[in-house]
Amino acid sequence: GSAMLFNIRLPQNFNSPFKANSLINFWQRWHMTLTSFLTNYIFNPSVKALKEVTFVKMMLIIIMVFIICGFWHGPSWMYGFFGLLHGLGLVVNHIFNKLFNFKLPKIFSWFLTFTYVNLTFIFFRTQNFDNAILVISKMFGLNKIGEGVFLTKEFYILIALIIVCFIINSLFKNSYELFSKYLYFKGNN
């Protein structure tokens, strides 16, 4: 970007997060500088401070870190709740990985991740819980405004667009992947 005009190298902050096929993978790709900061200065010291490290304690620390991550964005319960939802989602992801020795089909795991992330972003962007519930209820047709939305031509066009976006997102490289092959960009992770 424009920082390169002044020979300033900024760390990569996003790496196609909507290509993620798990919530763990999403946070490895999304807001990478914040995730790194939280890992280095909150998660790791919290784990090191434990006398006995257990899976349950580590999962509780993950939840705590993501609540802090939420409040890092602003002093609002909505941000804290967003962090709680992501912390709980990560815990479920870790428990699933620990208990089951198989992976879901890529498209299914991508769809679950994409849906979960976007539903939780509603809590991040709305002013209060009532507004968040209203948005969600309108999305799923749980009120008079959304009645019959699943039978309209627009609904099927939307589904087609989502499928096209998934294909583009999955098959094509992002700008960093495209331009990193040029010598000027090498080593600028």
At which residue positions do the language-model features occur?
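Membrane-embedded transmembrane alpha-helical bundles that form the catalytic cores
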Residues: G1-C165, N169-N189
